[in-house]
Amino acid sequence: MKVVILGYGSIGKRHAQNLKKLGHEVIPLDLNYKLRFDVDCAFICTPTQFHVNHATEYIERGIPVFIEKPLTYNMEELEKIESLVKKQPVISMVGCNLRFHPSLLKAKIIASTRRVIYARAETGYYLPFWRQEDYRKSYSASEYGGIVLDAIHEPDYLYWLFGDIKDLKMVCDKVSNLEIKKEDIAEIGIIFESGLSASVHCDYLMKNYHRKLDLYMPHEVISFKIQPTNIMYKKEVQYFLDCVKERKEPMNNIKEAGYVLSKILEGSGYNPSKAYINQTAPEDIKEDR
């Protein structure tokens, strides 16, 4: 297949490398390049605030789109793209690479076959270590970023494991002196329609990479460490391209991803327009210099 990748940052380059290894023709485009439409599908890997506009260009032409997470950053943009795909259906998928992680595939089997009574997801990594070039110039640090949208993988895979969400509440804040405009720490509580409850912790503060899922059962707790691996990205890309080839609707299409995102954007305790400008942390919790 011929695939255009719009946005050639770290995730765009990763997708390009994986696509080439899978034998596909890749056309990488940065923001200042003219869009190409002579392709079989498009990967939208630009900063979050451009996702909807760039995806729209391809959707209106009936070209399948893969959009990196998060789908967008506010309800207005979300409603715009949801309205578009209702009028003009197209094969679409939003990034959900953790659904392809070996540890979470095992968790999926357990969640489907055993009685889970509670779930706890955690993720954290110090932002300057995560965004290694200059974190202050990354989308994470911008008004369109923040740890809640950066860590949308956790609510997404919990939804994938346990189904529709009845209620979602959160507490989020900026507690460090990282030079960012949004929250750097959050606690999210979720109640599913099944009655199961779960919680998520996410932050930009942990100096060592940390990501795990704990599934509580009546007589034991099973923990899943979620270590970085390229395997999940390759499987994600192959899955999407198989759907394009077979003209099959992928999981986590725009409608499904929009459902989870809307729960977060509308969740009690989260204000997507709030910026933590010029806030600094107390001296005793500032990070090491």
Label every model-predicted segment.
Residues 1-37:
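N-terminal Rossmann-like dinucleotide-binding module
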Residues 15, 32-84, 287-288:
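Beta-loop-alpha module in the N-terminal Rossmann-like domain of NAD(P)-dependent dehydrogenases
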Residues 20, 32, 41-46, 193, ...:
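C-terminal helix-rich "cap/oligomerization" subdomain common to oxidoreductases
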Residues 61-63, 88-91, 196:
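A short helix->loop->beta-strand "cap" motif at the edges of active sites that frequently abuts
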Residues 80-97, 115-119:
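Rossmann-fold dehydrogenase core element
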Residues 98-168, 176-179:
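Predominantly a Rossmann-like dinucleotide-binding segment in NAD(P)-dependent oxidoreductases
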Residues 177-186, 191-242, 250-251:
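NAD(P)-dinucleotide binding in Rossmann-like oxidoreductases
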